[in-house]
A protein has these predicted regions:
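A generic, well-ordered mixed alpha/beta core segment in the N-terminal half of proteins
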Residues: 79-160
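Structural signature of FAD isoalloxazine-binding scaffolds in flavoprotein oxidoreductases
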Residues: 51-70, 84, 135-155, 187-190, ...
Length: 251
């Protein structure tokens, strides 16, 4: 038996299931290749934190990457971490906390906003959507923090771009193209992300104002002030009742 035949044998899956849960890169390749050959629409899912975002579509099968997770390599001194795409943001934060580091682009926690239960999703989901938090204007979007990746395109072919430092990228930067493509161009399998040290102290100032014009005026003043804020966000009053600020405390 050839090496390729052994690989196919070891990663062989039951494709009759509606939800496919690969635990290896080879299994992801096999699943996508099968769906491509059979012309089967495929939904890509991690922890389901962003399922309500975007346009709904009809899919016959779901590729669930929640079981394909784990830290591959973490180099605090080199300011990067390499993880599998199904790794939860929570797990990554716990690892970075050990060295007082962070994902500076602040992955959104939509779970906390809409039902009060934290669900930041997976790193693959965050980067597929290119979502970032209130620090975006200061540190850039999620795609600005991707150093490199491995992935699988719609035909089931492995692709790779970048590495673990910015200078690894020459020509077209596929990382920036695929980040924000909502899984339509490729499924991430491994991702190298830039990390940064945490600040010694952070403070959040909340100004409640029901008037849209006045609220935006306050925000512009704050962001342009000499205090050099690291982030900012404006919530219109008509949205406020839909959000649950379950971890907001005052002093």
């Amino acid at each position: 038996m050839s090496m390729e035949e052994k690989l196919n044998f070891q990663t062989s899956q039951d494709f009759s299931a509606t939800i496919l849960k690969p635990k290896s890169e080879e299994a992801i390749v096999e699943a996508i290749k099968h769906c491509y050959k059979k012309n089967i629409p495929l939904e890509i899912n991690g922890l389901g934190s962003k399922k309500s975002i975007g346009k709904n579509f009809q899919s016959q099968k779901t590729l669930d990457l929640s079981s394909y997770s784990g830290v591959i390599k973490y180099e605090p001194e080199e300011l990067y971490i390499k993880v599998k795409s199904g790794t939860s943001i929570k797990a990554i934060k716990e690892e970075l906390d050990k060295k007082n580091q962070q994902l500076a682009f602040e992955p959104n926690d939509f779970g906390s906003l809409f039902d009060g239960k934290s669900n930041e999703g997976t790193i693959g989901g965050v980067l597929s959507c290119n979502f970032a938090g209130p620090r975006r204007f200061k540190v850039g979007s999620a795609r600005d923090h991707v150093l490199g990746f491995k992935g699988v395109n719609g035909k089931g072919e492995l692709i790779k771009s970048g590495g673990t430092v910015v200078k690894n990228v020459t020509g077209y930067d596929l990382s920036k193209i695929l980040t924000g493509s909502f899984g339509t161009l490729s499924v991430f399998t491994e991702i190298s992300v830039k990390v940064l040290p945490k600040a010694d102290l952070t403070k959040t100032l909340v100004i409640e104002n029901p008037h849209l014009k006045k609220g935006l005026e306050y925000l512009n003043i704050a962001l342009g002030s000499s205090t050099d804020p690291s982030g900012g966000v404006f919530y219109p009053e008509y949205f406020r009742n839909q959000f649950i600020f379950n971890d907001l405390t005052t002093e």
